[in-house]
Amino acid sequence: MNLWIDGRQVEAVPGERLLDAVRRLGLDHPELSRRPLAARIAGETFTLNYVPQREEQEDPAAMRRAMEASGGRITLLRYADSRGRQVYTRTVQFVLFLAIRQLYPGAVAKMNFTVGQTLNVTVEKEPAFTPGDVPALKERVAQLVEMDIPLLRKRITTQEAMAAFAAGGQVDQARLLSWRKTPYFDVYTYGDYMDYFYGEMAPSTGYLSVWDLVSDGGTGVQFCFPDSGNPDRVCQYRELPNFSAVFAESERWCHLMGCSTVADLNDLVQQGRLSELIRVNEALHERSFSQIADQILQREAKAVLLAGPSSSGKTTSANRLAVQLRVRGKQPVLISLDDYYRDRDTIAPGPDGKLDLEHINTIDTDLFRQHLSALLQGQRVQLPRFDFLTGRRTDTGKTLELDGDAIIIVEGLHGLNPVLLPKDVEKHLIFRMYVSALLPLNLDNHNRIPT
């Protein structure tokens, strides 16, 4: 059987792993930036521990079909590839949770949110986990990496997996598997520890060559991943207290509502309590906008600039905020940054020949600054409107002038960009906010759902 690994031909040896073939070709490297972490075969991700040439009855059908479909063509995945980073992350999870289990056998560790290129993991134990525990945990992780433990996946029945997870104190994973219809489940083990992270991992723990572990200042740690620009060095942890506080508050509410994992959500649905969960969340959402409206009035702001990624709910949030401001006797006026797009035929295409409509240069920032400055000074402006069918901006004839109770709400992708603000504007007149759809719900304590 011939294989083409990254375009180089090699003959598969019966019983030999992909990793061995990679090494025979001289494609393995000590530097993380060049080191293969996994392989892509016919669009699927495979571990480098996979054996292409083996007895047919031992070869899982999906893997065999992928090899046949690819014609033996294999692409290696490195850290620069998004799938390669996912493989690295799963390997990190296994090693970190194994280290926590070994140091604190009765502890409950939970994977939470990411801050930049770092991952937050909290540890619930008695006595409470503190920053003073971080050096010992870091040392244990380093030991597990140094041991270069092979990470081999094995298949067991779903019932066996449920029993093993429950016996090991991982009740959340056992509960999630109770909803699984497939009679088997794939796991990774080391000693009496068993886990799974819904995808392939690196061949061994020694592949975690670039990392750091720092305290989050409370009952957890921030795992620092390789720098995305240079994977051969660890990223710098930058504290974002407001960002972290929002995630922590969301997770606290999930806990209070008894809905921290997918198994919790399934139970609520089964108990007929889903509508109650939705109502409570809607009330919480309204309370958040009410508190924001109070902050706007306390600051005596006259313009709210609301930003967020595509489909994050910017328009919905702007309307909800407007309602709360009306309740407080104000007259909110909604303006969309989309109406300040430049005419499409005046926008230069990017290097790929396509228009990047998410770039700030597609917005007529000069006109927006003029209008915002004039409105804040009590002057009247004529509002534009962008016609997405024609790709051109038109004059609507609609004018706007703010009275004493008026507050502008501007929503758009670039709402936080300082280039939108007039140079002479007083800072207290501008209130900026960012909205995004957070999902603090985990599959289980060790597997988050990224957003």
Model-flagged regions — what are they?
Residues V410-T451:
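ATP-dependent NMP and nucleoside kinases share a basic, alpha-helical "lid"
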Residues L37, P60, R64-V87, A99, ...:
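Auxiliary tRNA-acceptor-end handling modules of aminoacyl-tRNA synthetases
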Residues M1-Q93, L98, Y104-V115, E126, ...:
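Ubiquitin-like/PB1-type beta-grasp interaction modules and other compact soluble beta-rich domains
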Residues V323-V333:
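Post-Walker A helix-loop "phosphate-sensing" segment adjacent to the P-loop in P-loop NTPases
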Residues V304-L306:
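Hydrophobic anchor at the beta1->P-loop junction of P-loop NTPases
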Residues V333, R342, T346-G391:
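Conserved nucleotide-sensing/catalytic segment adjacent to the nucleotide-binding pocket
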Residues S317-L321:
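Hydrophobic positions on the alpha1 helix immediately C-terminal to the Walker A/P-loop
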Residues K314:
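Conserved lysine of the Walker
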